[in-house]
């Protein structure tokens, strides 16, 4: 174990400013961590070690994170580094410019060491692809950590880095943190700096760091949020809990697609009791979205996005999509299936998703916060399904069932977080609690997260396959 393993990014930055070690020395420590843990857990796609070494001692010590190394999810443009999205089709893709969000990350004083594993183009619920392989859960390597920020979550949970970047378009900053025992935040839509090459904001996807501590996440949030005031004024740096007591709506199951595992339900009920002991008011309430209708609408939405990808892959290969060899069988067959969806049905799907905004706005006229499972299951077995399978209605339902509590939140534009407050006795895997607030109420969630972190600390609860127990 290296002596810095228990430090979060904020603590490391303080020690860098105190000159206990140099930025270059810290880079070498983190590189050794990667070299020890990645062969066992497979969380990396690309390394940027030489880039990080060259930048190390050029980062100002008065920058908030002062040169602390991090990893970025392999689904965002970083100038000069490969961006593969976990796909053969993207292996030669090297963006020339960093997007605005990445520029803010580096201005905050982070030093990028490399990129983390994802399912191909975030198209499946298990972090696995046919280029880099499957990412294993450090709590139980026979299991996955969901997706798509799986590599980043594993790197943090294994103690390799105190923070790693994630994107969340359907649950990706909540599902992997739930299964790895770390903190994951999905900010409100358009809250953060743009992560898109055109400078716009995706309708569903947003960016934020995954972390062991709330204070790391809150500081990173303040340094990468949009300062434009459109559509929300900046939140700023949130440093602790609020005295405000909240009215919380509790959901443990919705009766659709798949029943919530008893361990997951019981975990949320115990967290509800914790909230009541802290003075919050909790009552059970129905989940406001029909999971079957959501699954249908999301499939239609996906169908409206993939036509250009099909054209590009066929042009690059000179072959029909299924024969191109550039996409996994799962994604290619999913795209082919989606091609049959009519423009009228795509429009109907988008209308359903757009209507989630008023649906959740109505819910938050009654409640300050919703508490729900992150997923109805603890975690999927590592190879329960693989990228070489053909898309089917069964697989579509499998994915939709595991996204049913997270994906509607992206289209509603609400902030949400996974907080590590429970563990599975059967599997030894963490079970996150999913807190959701009204659009723009990111501060409220951070204040609640600080309170929960104080009431039930998780920072020093380590995975068995982590650097806490592995010599470096």
Say what each PLM segment does.
Residues 2-169, 273, 278:
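Gly/Ser-rich catalytic/binding loops embedded in alpha/beta enzyme cores
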Residues 5, 79-82, 206, 229-303, ...:
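Gly/Ser-rich, acidic/histidine-flanked active-site/gating loops
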Residues 19, 67, 161, 340-472:
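Glycine-rich, small-residue loops and helix-cap segments
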Residues 23-27, 57, 260-287, 310-321, ...:
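Acyltransferase
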Residues 30, 52, 217, 248, ...:
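Residue-level signal for inorganic ion chemistry
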Residues 65-88, 242-251, 303-361, 373, ...:
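Short helix-loop capping/hinge segments that flank enzyme active sites or metal/cofactor-binding pockets
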Residues 97-224, 410-423, 429-432:
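Short glycine/serine-rich loop segments
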Residues 186-272, 456-472:
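A short helix-breaking turn/cap at a secondary-structure junction
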